[in-house]
């Protein structure tokens, strides 16, 4: 059986940790002037992928 391929886009966006998959939060690319400093600061923090999405991410990262 051939090797499974890693989805490179997913590999760049998610990192496997002991607690699940770490990801960056959205809404911090543009139109930042109307967002408060507190909101932007909190959006810089990494968060975990939700439980429902973990199987899909794991399938695309077979060697993670």
Swiss-Prot record:
InterPro entries in the cross-refs: Ribosomal_bL35, Ribosomal_bL35-like, Ribosomal_bL35_CS, Ribosomal_bL35_sf
Gene Ontology MF, one: structural constituent of ribosome
Cross-referenced SUPFAM superfamilies: L35p-like
Taxonomy, superkingdom: Bacteria
Short name of one Pfam family: Ribosomal_L35p
GO BP terms, alphabetized: translation
UniProt entry keywords in alphabetical sequence: Ribonucleoprotein, Ribosomal protein
Record keyword Transferase present: no
Disulfide-linked positions: none
HAMAP family tied to this protein: Ribosomal_bL35
Family according to the record: Belongs to the bacterial ribosomal protein bL35 family.
Protein's UniProt name: Large ribosomal subunit protein bL35
Biological classification of the source: Bacteria, Pseudomonadati, Pseudomonadota, Gammaproteobacteria, Alteromonadales
Gene: rpmI
